[in-house]
Amino acid sequence: MIPTPSLVVDLAAFDHNVDEMARERPGSALRPHVKAFKSTALARRLRDRGGHRSFCCATLREMEGMVDAGLGEDLLLANETLDAERLGRLVRRSPGRVTVAVDSEATLEVAARASASVLVDVDVGMPR
């Protein structure tokens, strides 16, 4: 019996999908979202097999895990954060670029205090 929670992956299917992704969107043209698989081992496989060096994270904790695993070359925080100290520590520890998606003045101020790059999220009337 497999203990739960457990991540079970069909590596042949995973590798096939990575190969397809790499062919369609090589390198940094695709930014896989870490929350989809929550595994630095799979992120490393995406990097090593598919050449993907840019990743999207939902939380600072996911970003910290990626940096700790040596996968912090180009990270995007998709959700806002108000923790400037923690974000600043992450920016200083990361060997590459840390970008924060901002959709409010408060998040923009946090990103600026942390010296993070920003991606401005504009509501064009189709809120998600």
Label the model's feature ranges.
Residues 1-9:
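Generic N-terminal amphipathic, Lys/Arg-enriched alpha-helix
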